[in-house]
Amino acid sequence: MNKYLSLFFLFFLSCSESDYSDLLLNKLKINKSDYDEYLINRSNGIHKLGGVNETDSTWGIITAHGYYPMGWSTKGFEWVSPIVELSHRQIPVWFFKYDWNDCPEYSADYLYRETDKLIENNSHLDSLWIIGHSLGGVVTSLFAEKWEQDFPITIHSIAAPLAGMERRGPDCEYISREKYKISSSVSYTQWKTVKAQDGAFKNLKFDPQEVFIDGGTSILLPEMWKNSRLGHNRSIQWVCENI
């Protein structure tokens, strides 16, 4: 029994050590072959990016990742270059880590609580942007319906299956939507990829991005960008360079 307890302790310790406590700009590895999942291997919550030369701290940007299948070896890599791009604005940047296997509505509530806490602890902020991709775009869109504070929030939802998606668990509500009604305190933009160019959507019978946004804007991204297909993950970079 002691042998098994020792093995369990070592396993738990190794798992704990894989969660990074810092989030530093100069530790983000842009080359895919060198990527070590530094961005994603951390506790749930909102993490501030360190090492940014901030010249304006009155507003900032929160980024929200998507879903990762089991065994995916480069979790979070699609966000590295976009986050570096956002850091050039010289404003505070945060990364929102959540359990992508949890129900999206629960993750939206969690984002609400964490954002509320962030605002409370940073009284110098007068506005925030939140950029969500894929499942993160669903989470931020559900958040955009719920936000009831006077504090202004700008939401950018990128390549998100807003019309419907599989349940994340037996207790999760099945998302089947035709419409999102955005809160009056939120400025909302949906960025849609061209379905045929999006590896996550192109083989589906319908485009899960097709919904009506009541109180927001919906924009279709170009098919190509810099002589390459503008697909599911590259769409983040396009938006971060063009907003």
Positions of predicted regions on the chain:
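Short aromatic-enriched loop/helix-cap "lid" or pocket-rim segments at secondary-structure transitions
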Residues: K75-G76, R167-P170, A200-K205
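Glycine-rich, phosphate-binding/catalytic loops in enzymes
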Residues: E78-P82, W147-E148, D171-I175, D207-Q209
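Active-site catalytic motif of lipid deacylating hydrolases and related acyltransferases
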Residues: C15-S127
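Serine-dependent carboxylesterase/thioesterase catalytic core
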Residues: I61, P69, I91-V93, N101, ...
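C-terminal catalytic-base region of ester-bond hydrolases, centering on the histidine
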Residues: I175-I243
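Sec-dependent N-terminal signal peptides
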Residues: Y4-L13
